[in-house]
């Protein structure tokens, strides 16, 4: 039975990526704006897995927290979206691990320290790996999905 992994970069500027290492297939979407959108996308992945005989997807959710200097309203909105994702994942019965950014980034290797350079590095890394153009907004989610087998301990 083929394994399927879902990488999630939470936040309005993030995304969700599904990855099947068996056939190297990826599918991604910009973070849905609503809880219903999150639920629908993840539930459709489960349905597709059932149709083709894949195992139940394993999720890696980037563990996030508020940042110094972030406004109160934006921090609340960010945390609310993160909690909604946790709820949807639990409601669908998906196995999930939460991983801080440094942990999944370490699986890729040495990266630039500056954020914009690091984002470009990650985008280039996923494009080389996938052989396709990947939008910047979803590059982290794709990278998380690609390193998910390692994070789950499934790469033996």
Each language-model region and where it sits:
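Phosphate- and other anionic-substrate recognition elements at nucleic-acid/protein interfaces
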Residues: 1-156
